[in-house]
């Protein structure tokens, strides 16, 4: 966004010379574009190219030098559009009738641009006499419309045709000379065929006269003139001027400002813009002709000598400003009429004195303006002074030189001077805004009309006005003034907008109209600033004069600090609003070519022509209630209608709305003269920062590009090298990715398009190309980088919003830890949940459960980790079995490819001989379990029965203690340890209750040693039992080792295996000890294959239900005996069948079966103290499988115990398989 220094403005763009429109579409191009305006107006050749280049560069406010040519026609427009935007909206309806006339004037204006200044000067005198009546109606309306069109920031810019109604003429009427100049100019333009020129010129002339017009008796015209000239002058630059003028006028005459708002609505009609486009080309010619005309003797001396001289010759030669019809009839005449109107406005400022164009008069009038210029010069010490009194005396040649050479300097001066002297300019703006235009006008118009304005402005801001007139650079200073009033950034923006407007005006009136001034975009700022000092009414008229003078003598641009700032837009503005730009350009051409006389006459005629002006004044007065800020916005709205009419150009125009913002800055320049009100207005309008402005511009560019993509712009995009718009359009395609931005503001697109279409006749070709270039360039700058960023960031937009755990004081677990695990839970849940919301809810529930279960941080961490593992297990894995077994033992190609260690783990294709852990069943499991079979020694150590070597059916236990009872009838109770006597049948001889502890003894560490307690009641060892039985009981299994059977070997078929079974038995106490009462066998799938109650051979003394779970009812109907069970088991098992159980020796003793192929879980999971200690099955299941068994008060279940043993053994095998890979 840095401002260009303008070092390359004098060099033709290498990418521009190829075609008339030039392929260069870069809004930031630092080179001169000769063909840009040429397309709009062939006559712009010399000056137009620089102006085009300058206007083309929306970011180089220093480019106002080319505006010197257009400054005459466009500068005023730039200022006027600000107040006119509001007025145009209000006047839209009333001006629709004038739109056609404005269009014609615009076309004529472009034609006039094509014609030499000599031709303008010739036509100007003719236009001056006939302009008086027609000019007010046609001229003002047309001017207003061009300005509105130019001002396209709001409806104002789009209302270029309505600009004909412009309040700038009203501003001009404010001063007697200015008002008449505007009316005369308008009519002269309409009649003379220079309607566009008259319109354009009138805004400028009216802008300055308006400042001085306040003092002038013709107040109604002053208001009316100010408004129409503002609209007319706005084109691109005229809009700037209109803004400044408008603000100045609104400050000086809010009534006038209001009319401008009304007229903004009515003059807003896009039709005149179309005309403006045709005349935009004329305007381009006009710039060239201006330069050439500046050299032309007669007109040049008059214009250069003194604005008065120009105005007088016009008045004398024409007698009366050309009428409206004449204005419409002759485009060239209209332009001259506009210039004449500008000069007349100057003359009005200083009563339209004799047209003496002699350098003496110029100097004398400039002398009056010199003091004013002196101040601006001081302000703009760094900026090259525009031809002020001296320059005015020099003549049109200087105007050319200054217009071309100084436009470059002017931008610099504007930058430097405005920045350096921004404080002074702020103060001077209220005055300088009016005075500068008037001083600039005298310089440009040989001091005739301009000096008067400076004189009148001196009252409001005579010092400022004169310095502005006295220096060409002061015009840039005026931009700085506006800056100072608003902000340096605002000035820069204004300068950029002005330079863009100038380039745009040279390229095409449309382009400038597209360019929205800051005032249009931020109507509040620019209008308020301009209106604050009361300059609005004066500014519009003064700006028209300025633009005319600057075109003719470049003194106007230099003379008017504001004009200098606006000149950038001024030149840019003529193409945008052909009528205003043509009028301003033609007036400037005419003044430079010696149209001073015509201008004076036109000024008088414009002032005298009261019909259109009165109507405009009335409309403006009606809109007086509308705020200056609102006016800019209202003006924007009417342009939306035009936008709808010109959708094809809407995309191109969209960028220019940003430029119109700059135009609004030009308006600020006009307001620079009125810093007091600007200051307040600037903050309101300024609120948008540079970044915000850039963002808005980017949005507008995107919208424009979107519309262009749908239009022939796509074709242009296909051939970017050939067409300037093609590259821009392609960029717009790139912008399309943001459909919101591209499609959001349709109204703005329509407005821009409408303005472009209105100026399509003349400058539209070049202007549209320039617009397209600027739009595409801006779009590419703003959106090309934005699009990729958005695309890259779009994934982040889809990122899941994770819930945040609120902080709580005194929480058990720090919130940070809880939040971390919650995020982990969400990530895991997202892997298997169908929706994000479901995953979040599940994670929240899991985290809450973990938090509720955790009394401390450490426990929460453990629980959270376990929960996280559980959630990870729920997530589907590419290799289902891998997660279960970790694939450590078996490394297969498939497992490695699917595992996390695939890149680090080596694998062998020959190794997968062993099955995967998940497939451990049948023979595979059998082969693995063979590793866990008890050895002979282990069998002996654990008390397993072995066949007796001597007694068939007998068994032997190697761990049994041989106790020889002293008495065969004496027994020892296995529960309480009490000795009791039994009969031969085994019954107790005495009935004694048995007090016992059913729980085992457990040693606990206590202070000073160990303590042994019973697990059942925690009573100390040796204490009385907690349970009572009817009688004592004995085990007796190891004492009776008869009736044992041994499993035998069987032949196996094919692929079958001997089998794997888990076994568990329940026993009850009988008269002979423990005997089998229930047996259960399960397979590897934990399916019960055999389960039955067994009736003991002896009488049951105690069912031992607490442990066996067998009740009397269970055995009541049982007829199965031990022999039956043995027969079944021998048929099921073979010698190689693997039997699994916990302390299986007790079960085998109960079954009286001898079997050595066993897997004992008590041995597989040994007690840490070793034998004889063994861990209970219940504890093993709780520790390893996290399962609780034997928790039923009714006793154990043999099937449950058998299944538990099978689970434990399979788990053990799999765990070992993981570690033994």
UniProtKB/Swiss-Prot annotation:
Pfam families: EloA-BP1. One of its GO terms (molecular function) is exonuclease activity. Residues 37-46 have a biased composition (Gly residues). It comes from the Eukaryota. Its main location: nucleus. Ubiquitously expressed. Gene3D superfamilies: Ribonuclease H-like superfamily/Ribonuclease H (3.30.420.10). The modification Omega-N-methylarginine is found at residue 191. Keywords: Coiled coil, Exonuclease, Hydrolase, Methylation, Nuclease, Nucleus, Phosphoprotein. InterPro entries: Exonuclease_RNaseT/DNA_pol3 (IPR013520), REX1-like_exo (IPR034922), REXO1-like_dom (IPR031736), REXO1/3/4-like (IPR047021), RNaseH-like_sf (IPR012337), RNaseH_sf (IPR036397). Residues 498-577 are annotated as: Interaction with ELOA. One of its GO terms (cellular component) is nucleoplasm. Belongs to the REXO1/REXO3 family. This is RNA exonuclease 1 homolog. It comes from Homo sapiens (Human). The gene is REXO1.
């Amino acid at each position: 966004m840095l401002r260009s220094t303008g070092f390359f403005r004098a060099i033709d763009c290498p990418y521009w010379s190829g075609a008339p429109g030039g392929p260069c579409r870069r809004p930031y191009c630092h080179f001169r574009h000769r063909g840009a305006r040429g397309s709009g107006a062939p006559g712009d050749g010399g000056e137009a190219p620089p102006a085009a280049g300058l206007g083309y560069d929306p970011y180089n406010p220093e480019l106002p030098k080319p505006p010197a040519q257009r400054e005459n026609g466009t500068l005023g427009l730039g200022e006027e559009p600000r107040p006119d935007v509001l007025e145009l909206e209000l006047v839209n309806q009333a001006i629709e009738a004038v739109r056609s006339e404005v269009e014609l004037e615009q076309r004529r204006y472009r034609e006039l641009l094509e014609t030499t200044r000599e031709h303008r000067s010739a036509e100007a005198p003719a236009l001056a006499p006939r302009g008086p009546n027609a000019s007010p109606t046609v001229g003002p309306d047309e001017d207003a419309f061009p300005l509105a069109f130019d001002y396209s920031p709001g409806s104002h810019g789009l209302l270029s045709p309505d600009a004909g109604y412009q309040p700038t003429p009203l501003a001009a009427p404010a001063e007697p000379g200015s008002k008449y100049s505007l009316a005369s100019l308008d009519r002269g333009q309409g009649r003379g065929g220079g309607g566009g020129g008259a319109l354009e010129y009138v805004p400028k002339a009216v802008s300055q006269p308006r400042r001085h017009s306040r003092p002038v008796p013709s107040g109604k015209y002053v208001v009316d003139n100010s408004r129409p000239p503002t609209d007319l002058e706005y084109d691109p630059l005229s809009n700037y001027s209109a803004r400044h003028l408008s603000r100045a006028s609104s400050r000086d005459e809010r009534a006038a400002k209001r009319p401008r708002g009304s007229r903004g609505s009515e003059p807003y009609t896009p039709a005149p813009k179309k005309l403006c486009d045709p005349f935009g080309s004329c305007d381009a010619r006009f710039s060239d002709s201006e330069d050439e005309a500046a050299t032309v003797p007669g007109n040049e001396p008059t214009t250069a000598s003194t604005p008065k001289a120009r105005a007088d010759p016009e008045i004398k030669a024409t007698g009366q400003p050309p009428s409206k019809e004449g204005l419409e009839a002759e485009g060239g005449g209209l332009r001259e009429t506009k210039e004449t109107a500008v000069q007349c406005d100057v003359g009005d400022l200083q009563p339209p004195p004799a047209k003496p164009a002699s350098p003496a008069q110029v100097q004398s009038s400039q002398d009056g303006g010199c003091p004013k210029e002196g101040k601006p010069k001081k302000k703009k010490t760094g900026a090259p002074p525009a031809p002020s009194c001296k320059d005015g005396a020099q003549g049109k040649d200087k105007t050319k030189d200054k217009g071309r050479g100084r436009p470059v300097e002017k931008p610099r001066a504007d930058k430097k001077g405005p920045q350096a002297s921004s404080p002074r300019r702020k103060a001077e703006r209220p005055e300088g805004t009016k005075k500068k235009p008037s001083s600039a006008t005298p310089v440009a118009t040989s001091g005739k009309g301009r000096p008067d304005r400076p004189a009148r402005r001196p009252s409001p801001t005579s010092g400022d006005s004169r310095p502005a007139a006295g220096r060409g650079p002061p015009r840039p200073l005026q931009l700085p003034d506006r800056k100072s009033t608003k902000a340096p950034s605002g000035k820069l923006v204004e300068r950029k907008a002005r330079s863009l407007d100038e380039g745009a005006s040279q390229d095409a009136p449309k382009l400038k109209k597209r360019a929205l001034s800051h005032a249009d975009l931020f109507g509040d700022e620019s209008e308020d600033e301009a209106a604050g000092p009361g300059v609005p009414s004066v500014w519009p008229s003064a700006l028209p004069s300025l633009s005319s003078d600057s075109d003719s003598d470049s003194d106007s641009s230099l003379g008017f600090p504001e004009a200098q700032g606006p000149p950038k837009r001024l030149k840019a503005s003529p193409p945008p609003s052909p009528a205003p730009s043509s009028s301003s350009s033609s007036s400037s051409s005419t003044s430079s070519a010696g149209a001073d006389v015509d201008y004076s006459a036109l000024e008088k005629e414009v002032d005298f022509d009261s019909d259109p002006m009165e109507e405009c004044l009335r409309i403006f007065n009606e809109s007086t209630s509308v705020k200056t800020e609102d006016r800019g916005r209202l003006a924007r709205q009417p342009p939306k209608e035009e936008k709808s009419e010109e959708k094809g150009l809407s995309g191109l125009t969209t960028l220019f709305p940003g430029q119109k913002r700059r135009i609004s800055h030009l308006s600020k320049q006009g307001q620079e003269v009125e810093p007091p009100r600007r200051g307040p207005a600037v903050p309101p309008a300024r609120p948008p920062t540079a970044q915000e402005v850039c963002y808005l511009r980017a949005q507008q560019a995107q919208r424009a590009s979107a519309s262009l993509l749908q239009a022939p712009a796509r074709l242009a995009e296909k051939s970017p090298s050939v067409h300037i718009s093609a590259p821009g359009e392609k960029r717009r395609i790139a912008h399309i990715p943001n459909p919101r931005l591209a499609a959001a503001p349709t109204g703005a697109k329509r407005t821009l398009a409408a303005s472009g279409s209105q100026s399509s006749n003349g400058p539209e070709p070049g202007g549209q190309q320039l617009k397209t270039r600027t739009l595409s360039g801006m779009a590419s700058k703003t959106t090309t980088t934005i699009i990729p960023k958005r695309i890259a960031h779009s994934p982040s937009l889809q990122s899941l919003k994770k819930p945040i755990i609120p902080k709580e004081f005194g929480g058990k677990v720090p919130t940070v830890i809880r939040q971390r695990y919650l995020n982990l839970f969400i990530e895991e849940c997202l892997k298997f949940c169908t929706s994000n919301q479901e995953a979040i809810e599940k994670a929240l529930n899991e985290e809450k459960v973990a938090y509720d279960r955790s009394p401390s941080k450490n426990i929460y961490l453990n629980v959270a980790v376990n929960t996280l593992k559980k959630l990870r297990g729920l997530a589907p894995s590419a290799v289902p079995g891998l997660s279960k077994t970790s694939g450590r033992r078996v490394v297969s190609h498939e497992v490695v490819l699917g595992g996390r260690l695939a890149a680090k783990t080596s694998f062998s294709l020959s190794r997968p001989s062993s099955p995967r852990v998940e497939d451990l069943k049948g023979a595979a499991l059998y082969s693995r379990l063979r590793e866990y079979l008890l050895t002979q020694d282990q069998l002996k150590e654990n008390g397993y029965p072995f066949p007796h070597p001597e007694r068939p059916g007998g068994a032997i236990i190697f761990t049994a203690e041989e106790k020889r009872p002293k008495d065969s009838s004496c027994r020892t109770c296995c529960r309480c340890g009490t000795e009791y006597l039994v009969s031969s049948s085994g019954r107790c001889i005495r009935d004694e209750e048995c007090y016992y502890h059913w729980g085992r003894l457990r040693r606990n560490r206590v202070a000073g040693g160990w303590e042994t307690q019973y697990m059942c009641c925690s009573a100390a060892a040796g204490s009385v039992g907690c349970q009572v039985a009817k009688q004592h009981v004995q085990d007796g299994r190891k004492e009776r080792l008869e009736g044992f059977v041994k499993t035998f070997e069987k032949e196996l078929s094919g692929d079958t295996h001997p089998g794997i079974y888990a076994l568990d038995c329940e026993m009850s106490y009988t008269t002979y000890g423990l005997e089998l009462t229930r047996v259960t066998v399960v397979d590897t799938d934990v399916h019960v294959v055999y389960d039955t109650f067994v009736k003991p051979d002896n009488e049951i003394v105690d069912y031992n239900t607490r442990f066996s779970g067998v009740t009397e009812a269970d055995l009541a109907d049982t007829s199965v005996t031990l022999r039956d069970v043995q027969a079944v088991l021998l048929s099921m098992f073979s010698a190689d069948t693997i039997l699994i159980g916990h302390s299986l020796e007790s079960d085998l003793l109960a079954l009286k079966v001898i079997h050595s192929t066993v897997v004992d879980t008590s041995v597989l999971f040994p007690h840490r103290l070793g034998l004889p200690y063994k861990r209970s099955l219940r504890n093993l299941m709780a520790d390893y499988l996290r399962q609780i068994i034997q928790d039923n008060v009714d006793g154990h279940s043999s099937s449950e115990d058998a299944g538990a043993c099978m689970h434990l053994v399979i788990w053990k095998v799999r765990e070992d398989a993981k570690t033994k890979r």
